[in-house]
Amino acid sequence: MSVRMLTAPLILLVIGVAARAADPGDAAAGKAYFSQTCMQCHTADPAEGGGEIGPSLVGLYGRTAGVGDDRFAYSAALKGSKLVWTQETLDHFLTDPATAVPGTTMAVPVPMKADRDNLIAYFRSLSSGTK
């Protein structure tokens, strides 16, 4: 076998591993966690308005914090944070919302890293249209 024939599959393997590392989490597990924990306050259904207490999280990933659901009055702290919801900012915020954005009304942390990664994967799927 030639070196060229071995190199191409190796490159594809490395690219696949790198892509997986860039997108941690399992969207299906995140949806299950969301249903059990987050739906007490939020919704992720575009046909519904916000949740009972918090805003709809449809389209959250990639959006600026404090905007997106016109039916919800976001806190001045969240609106003033200028955060854009990415893997990193969501992970930091969900770890301890009150520390990440002092004055936010979001009070429930997600302490387990795997749960945060799964939730963020679910939020990404809601933003990309694949649930």
Which residue ranges define each predicted feature?
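Detector for the c-type heme attachment site
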Residues: 42-48, 62, 95
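Short Fe-S-cluster ligation motifs
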Residues: 68-84
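Bacterial N-terminal signal peptides that target proteins for export
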Residues: 1-8
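Hydrophobic h-region of N-terminal signal peptides that target proteins for export
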Residues: 11-21, 127
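Electrostatic cytochrome c docking/interface patches
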Residues: 17-35, 45-50
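Protein kinase-like catalytic domain
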Residues: 41-42, 127
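N-terminal, post-signal-peptide region of Sec/Tat-exported proteins
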Residues: 48-71
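C-terminal capping alpha-helices of c-type cytochrome domains
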Residues: 84-131
